Each structure stands twice: as structure tokens, then as C-alpha cells.
Amino acid sequence: MKSKRLVMFWVVMVVTIILDQMIKAWVRGHLNVGQSWSGGPWHGIFEITLTYNKGIAFGMLQGGGLIMTPIAVIIAGYAIFTIYRNRGESTWATIALGLLASGAIGNLIDRVFNGKDGVTDMFLLRLANITHGKMNDFPVFNIADSCISVAMVMLLISWSKNPVSDKVDPKLAPEPVIEDPAV
């Protein structure tokens, strides 16, 4: 069972990194910055638009993306460490950790190899604002961003269903200290 979870973690992580990088490469090869493509039943609601994000998620902290490089390494390292340390975790948590690592690594690849351009973003959702009767643009995002967002929701749900126990594993508990009354 433990090895199945490890395989699942690595498959989720590797497949989503490859998917993220392939879509980013396709968009960079077929669209110019700011150019959009939209079609089918989602026309006007969902667009593929090439943008570069030099900040963090959803375009915040523009120019502050450099700090995300070490943070991405820490996040990916945390996910990998956790999956090896807690191999008995649920399937849900295993998938979430794979998505978390892949999202961090996917955007890290962009930061390292795109350098000055930043992270490639491409998915644009236009959401209806019923108060003002117009469409509002949701910040442009990519597969890696989606992986991180979905992973965080999954982990929060997993943690709420299985809160961290205060019980100490008997194998890890320290030996009791017996005081010598003669001392």
C-alpha cells in the first residue's frame, strides 16, 4: 500500500508538470503577448491569453516573484518529505501533495528558464458580475497555479477530516524516567 501511494504521488506530480509545461510551450509558440484565442461554447467566458507574471499568484506583488524561487523549492521539498515520512496517508492527501509539488515546480521551471519574462500564464475567465451587469476578468492563471489551488483545498479538507493527533507513536515515545528514591 505504501509503495502504491508513492507511485501515485510521483505519477500525479510528473504528469501535471509535463501537462503544465507542454501547454505553456504551445501558448508561447502560437500566441503573442496579450493575444487571445477563444472559441466554442465558452467564447467570451473562457480565453487563452498569453501573459507573463513577474509577481506571485494572480498577478500580485509584480516584480516580487524572485522571492518565490526559494519558496517554491521549500514547498516542493515539503511535499516530497511529507509523502515519504507519512506514506500511510490517504489517497486524497497523496494526490494533493503531488499537485502541490507539481504546481511549485511548474512555476519554478518558468522562473528559472524564462528569467526576465517570469511565469507564463494563459487561462482567462470572464465572470458575470450580477451587481453591475458586466463581466469581470479573473486573474490570468496556468495549470501550475490550478494545481496549487486545488491541492490547498484538498489538504484543508483532508486535515479537517483527519486532524493531527496529539497521541505520540509508542515507537517514538521517550523511555519513562524512573527516579531512584535513594538519591
Q: Predicted regions span which residues?
A:
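Alpha-helical transmembrane bundles and membrane-interface segments of multipass inner-membrane proteins
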Residues: 1-183
